[in-house]
C-alpha cells in the first residue's frame, strides 16, 4: 500500500489534494471519512491514514470558514463606514 493520501496521485489510496477542495467538498469527504472510521473494519495503518486525512480535511474546512468570516466582517465594516460617511454628508448638507 503506497502513501498517497493528499498527494493526488493515481492509485487505490489516492485522494485529491486537500488544498484543491472547496469547503463543501472537504466537508462531505470529512463526513464520509468519519463514517468509514466509525465502522472500525480497517487495520491500524489504513485507519491512521483515514484519520490523518480527516484531520487535514477538518483543518481545510476551518480555514474556509475563517476566510468566509473575515470576508463577512470586512463587508460589514465597509458597509458601516459607508453608512457613517453618508450620514455625515447628510448632516453637513452634502448630497
UniProtKB/Swiss-Prot annotation:
Its main location: cytoplasm. One of its GO terms (biological process) is DNA catabolic process. The keyword Aminoacyl-tRNA synthetase does not apply. It catalyses: Exonucleolytic cleavage in either 5'- to 3'- or 3'- to 5'-direction to yield nucleoside 5'-phosphates. Bidirectionally degrades single-stranded DNA into large acid-insoluble oligonucleotides, which are then degraded further into small acid-soluble oligonucleotides. Belongs to the XseB family. This is Exodeoxyribonuclease 7 small subunit. It comes from Corynebacterium aurimucosum (strain ATCC 700975 / DSM 44827 / CIP 107346 / CN-1).
Amino acid at each position: 500500500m503506497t502513501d498517497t493520501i493528499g498527494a493526488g496521485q493515481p492509485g487505490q489510496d489516492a485522494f485529491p489534494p486537500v488544498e484543491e477542495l472547496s469547503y463543501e467538498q472537504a466537508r462531505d469527504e470529512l463526513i464520509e471519512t468519519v463514517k468509514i472510521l466509525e465502522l472500525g473494519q480497517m487495520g491500524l495503518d489504513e485507519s491512521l491514514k483515514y484519520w490523518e486525512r480527516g484531520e487535514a480535511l477538518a483543518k481545510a474546512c476551518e480555514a474556509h470558514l475563517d476566510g468566509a468570516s473575515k470576508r463577512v466582517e470586512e463587508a460589514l465594516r465597509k458597509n458601516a463606514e459607508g453608512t457613517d460617511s453618508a450620514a455625515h454628508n447628510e448632516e453637513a448638507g452634502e448630497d
